[in-house]
């Protein structure tokens, strides 16, 4: 017969309560997975999962199609697929709305924007930034350029501008140049009457060395009409009153210091000499203007 257990049938055992984990020893509870609501792009623009998966699928399809195709067919198919991806992103807000140009003067900005080839609502992800940079660097104002895409709708063009140094006249043609003698083709010389005028073959390359020295001498600078390059070796300075100052081919700075000293002592720039010859470091030669007697007509060129 079955054994009899006193006290009736056994009661089910209650599970022991687990002791609370110590803050210092327990493992942190795993975080709950966040719902994939949006995949955020730069500057706070979101892509829905549907759009993101569509783009990923298009990119994968592009790779497979191009792998199966060869030659011009692959190029055409690849370009078509890229346009499709661009259009997908563009529909999500990746279209060009703003172009920021930094480091350029107001005069140069219009030329830079035109050369860039950028246009409103252009797909921003598909644009070739290297190509944009090459076009911008083709502008005469631009010494160097950097192009940055700022998603979703902005492009930044940062440039190092060539500062206009002088107007160069050669063979009857006038051009604006920078300190390296580089012609700024987009600059209209008529819009820069404040720039000094340099004349002659080689004047464009040599102007960057002599003009700062002249600019640092206000009395000479304010009287200067033009600087003429002679035999691509030296300078003649033509003043507004018709005077001519001849500089040596070597050590122009010493000759200008000598002119400073004469002007401080004798105000030689106010004396109206026809010529001041500084080519000989040991001697300054001057030639007065031809005197005209009362009632006598002046000779041509006097």
Swiss-Prot record:
It is found in: Cell inner membrane. It is a single-pass type II membrane protein. Residues 18-38 have a biased composition (Low complexity). Residues 94-162 form the POTRA domain. Keywords: Cell cycle, Cell division, Cell inner membrane, Cell membrane, Membrane, Transmembrane, Transmembrane helix. GO terms for cellular component: cell division site; plasma membrane. It holds the Pfam family FtsQ_DivIB_C. InterPro entries: Cell_div_FtsQ/DivIB_C, FtsQ, POTRA, POTRA_FtsQ_type. Residues 1-50 are cytoplasmic. Disulfide bonds: none annotated. Residues 72-302 are periplasmic. GO terms for biological process: cell septum assembly; FtsZ-dependent cytokinesis. Its main location: membrane. Residues 1-41 are annotated as: Disordered. The chain crosses the membrane at residues 51-71. Belongs to the FtsQ/DivIB family. FtsQ subfamily. Essential cell division protein. This is Cell division protein FtsQ.
């Amino acid at each position: 017969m079955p054994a009899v257990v006193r006290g009736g049938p056994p009661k089910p055992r209650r599970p022991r309560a687990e002791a609370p984990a110590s803050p210092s020893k327990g493992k942190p509870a795993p975080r709950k997975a966040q719902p994939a609501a949006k995949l955020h792009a730069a500057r706070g623009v979101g892509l829905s999962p549907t759009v993101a998966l569509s783009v990923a699928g298009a990119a994968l399809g592009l790779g497979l199609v191009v792998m199966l195709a060869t030659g011009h067919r692959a190029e055409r198919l690849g370009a078509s697929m890229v346009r499709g991806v661009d259009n997908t992103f563009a529909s999500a807000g990746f279209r060009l709305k703003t172009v920021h140009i930094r480091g350029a003067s107001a005069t140069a900005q219009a030329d830079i924007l035109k050369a860039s080839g950028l246009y409103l609502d252009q797909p921003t992800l598909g644009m070739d930034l290297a190509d944009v940079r090459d076009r911008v660097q083709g502008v005469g104002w631009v010494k160097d350029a950097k192009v940055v895409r700022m998603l979703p709708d902005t492009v930044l063009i940062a440039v190092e501008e060539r500062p206009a140094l002088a107007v160069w006249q050669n063979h009857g043609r006038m051009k604006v140049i920078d300190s390296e003698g580089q012609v700024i083709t987009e600059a209209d010389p008529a819009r820069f009457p404040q720039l000094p005028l340099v004349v002659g073959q080689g004047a464009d390359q040599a102007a960057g060395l002599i003009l700062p020295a002249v600019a640092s001498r206000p009395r000479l600078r304010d009287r200067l009409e033009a600087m003429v390059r002679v035999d691509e070796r030296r300078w003649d300075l033509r003043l507004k009153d018709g005077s001519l100052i001849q500089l040596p081919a070597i050590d122009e700075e010493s000759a200008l210091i000598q002119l400073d000293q004469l002007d401080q002592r004798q105000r030689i720039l106010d004396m109206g000499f026809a010529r001041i010859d500084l080519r000989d470091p040991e001697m300054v030669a001057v030639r007065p203007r031809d005197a005209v007697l009362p009632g006598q007509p002046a000779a041509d060129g006097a």
